[in-house]
């Protein structure tokens, strides 16, 4: 992409978050951080305090709003550009899709936090960057380990973006008649995630961090109940989006996807590949509910 196109995308991203800047409100945790000055130690986000102190030049946990919101927008656009460049050849699709991460309705809440938004944005970027090196598996493993560890230490939920990108790459391969199931990519991604999570857990234990929240769902009855609770809450979110007028955005996208699959079937693409790509797509959706 040419530099002027990059600039145009970044301008759109900044305009998108401008209403948040103009609203100038403190959102949920912002009020506690402002009045009590507490950080993210109890969340297991051990790098969050470090990064925030660095941004304030050692002056403690202070708000750099609106610069934090604007910088978060830039970082999320960069993340989107990295992903869209991997997935699409058409330049117009690249331009449009590079804004999808930033403009996700669920990301809008994250952008509303004065203190946390930039940490979340850097965490998302860290989860995306390793796939730049996906063709070089040793480098991919090393960068995945480092970047995922950073992501865990900033905002654990963002690590799910790592698997989402991997699934998107598998969808692309299915539709392009490449490997329908890339065992090497899947194995390396899973191993990198497990190793980084183990190291993160050991680090939390070594530093004696008391995890008050932000842990991952456990594989037991309580974990199953939490999954059901998440599914119900997301059903409520989607219903709220749908009745708010977001359906006018959703339905054209759904129709375009269906027409694309029909077109591929008529062109003689293997039905098994198309079905597998749908499974991968559902996996991307589910990953947003399971952190």
Residue ranges and their predicted role:
Residues 1-15:
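Start-transfer (signal-anchor) and selected internal transmembrane alpha helices
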Residues 16-73, 96, 114, 118, ...:
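Transmembrane catalytic cores of multi-pass membrane glycosyltransferases
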Residues 60-68, 90-93, 136-143, 147:
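Membrane-interface starts of transmembrane alpha-helices
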Residues 70-91, 129, 260-266:
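Transmembrane-helix motifs of polytopic, lipid-linked glycan transferases
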Residues 76, 119-128, 161-169:
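Hydrophobic core segments of transmembrane alpha-helices in multi-pass, intramembrane catalytic enzymes
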Residues 83-106, 125, 138-139:
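Transmembrane-helix signature of polytopic, membrane-embedded enzymes
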Residues 102, 106-128:
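Membrane-proximal helix-loop-helix units in multi-pass membrane proteins
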Residues 127-141, 175-180:
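Membrane-interface transmembrane helices that cradle and orient dolichyl/undecaprenyl
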């Amino acid at each position: 992409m040419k530099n002027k196109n990059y600039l145009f995308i970044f301008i759109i991203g900044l305009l998108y978050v401008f209403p948040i800047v103009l609203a100038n409100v403190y959102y949920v945790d912002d009020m506690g951080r402002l009045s009590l000055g507490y950080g993210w130690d109890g969340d297991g986000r051990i790098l969050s305090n470090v990064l925030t102190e660095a941004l304030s030049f050692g002056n403690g946990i202070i708000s750099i709003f609106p610069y934090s919101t604007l910088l978060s927008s830039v970082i999320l656009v960069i993340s989107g550009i990295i992903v869209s460049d991997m997935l699409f050849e058409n330049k117009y699709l690249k331009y449009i899709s590079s804004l999808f991460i930033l403009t996700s309705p669920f990301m809008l809440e994250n952008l509303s936090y004065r203190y946390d938004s930039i940490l979340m944005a850097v965490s998302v970027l860290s989860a995306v960057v390793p796939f730049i090196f996906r063709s070089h598996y040793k480098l991919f493993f090393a960068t995945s380990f480092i970047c995922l560890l950073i992501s865990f230490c900033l905002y654990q939920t963002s690590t799910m973006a790592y698997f989402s990108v991997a699934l998107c790459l598998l969808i692309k391969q299915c539709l392009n008649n490449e490997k329908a199931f890339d065992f090497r990519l899947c194995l390396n991604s899973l191993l990198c995630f497990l190793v980084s999570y183990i190291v993160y857990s050991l680090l939390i234990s070594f530093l004696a961090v008391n995890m008050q929240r932000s842990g991952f769902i456990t594989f037991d009855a309580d974990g199953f109940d939490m999954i059901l609770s998440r599914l119900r809450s997301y059903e409520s979110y989607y219903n709220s989006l749908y009745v708010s007028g977001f359906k006018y955005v959703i339905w054209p996208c759904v129709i375009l996807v269906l027409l694309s699959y029909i077109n591929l079937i008529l062109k003689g693409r293997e039905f098994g590949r198309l079905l597998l790509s749908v499974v991968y797509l559902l996996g991307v959706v589910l990953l947003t509910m399971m952190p």
